[in-house]
């Protein structure tokens, strides 16, 4: 490793093909068959088109060889390509910008990165119109599936590593409150639903997953009832509070039209609130690091406003 030097052109196609060739020699069902690609993604020799790269990655994914990517560098970093080929390779993508981030990905999270415990994980959430007028999923824009693809085991979806959790956040407009969409001309079935046996359900959650990539999917179903409802964000679980803090910070950075008057300081306050619980484990300091990031963004805001 110490003898490697970065120079000259980058032939990502040949590098991947060589890696797949070597992985094929030891390919074994039930084992970890994964390629770890470290690059800035600036491929200037051979295939550089994202779609063509994904075809190569998908073909080997279907043979049982996964691909994870680590992004390095700044100026020529092809973040989009790195994420896409990792997503389509049943892998993970991480950007390494510091020694601490490298330690987090390659040490603290190594088990989760390489050990997949659930394949092709799909989440489907149906809201009860008796309680919810509007909703939007925050994030996952490039991972959305058509409704009919949920039950199709041939459709590729996300992988879940050992010890990892996935958060899906929805912003909703409760029934009767002002929303972003104009009222419909024709009546809906809200009144009928309000009188049925499911009127205490806010929504219904379905999860599909495969124990192994080759297995048939298993279905989990769970009603989300009014018992699960919290009167305010401050009374929510600390992990939920932190997830909302991170999501709102990202929306603020993107200048989302839905963020309204939410400021960086609001994300800081919510993250600090989640850290105030003794049950929260932040041994690696990652959540504290996020708080520092929100504070830095707030400090830089006046400079950005002047530009």
Where are these predicted regions, by residue range?
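Exposed acidic/Ser/Thr-rich ligand/metal-binding surfaces
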Residues: 1-121, 180-195, 281, 286, ...
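Polar, glycine-rich mid-to-C-terminal structural blocks
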Residues: 66, 88-97, 102-165, 169-171
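Long, acidic serine/threonine- and proline-rich intrinsically disordered regions
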Residues: 140-166, 172-307
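Flexible glycine-/small-residue-rich
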Residues: 37-39, 71, 125-127, 171-174, ...
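Short, glycine-/Ser/Thr-/acidic-enriched flexible segments
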Residues: 41-43, 74, 100, 130, ...
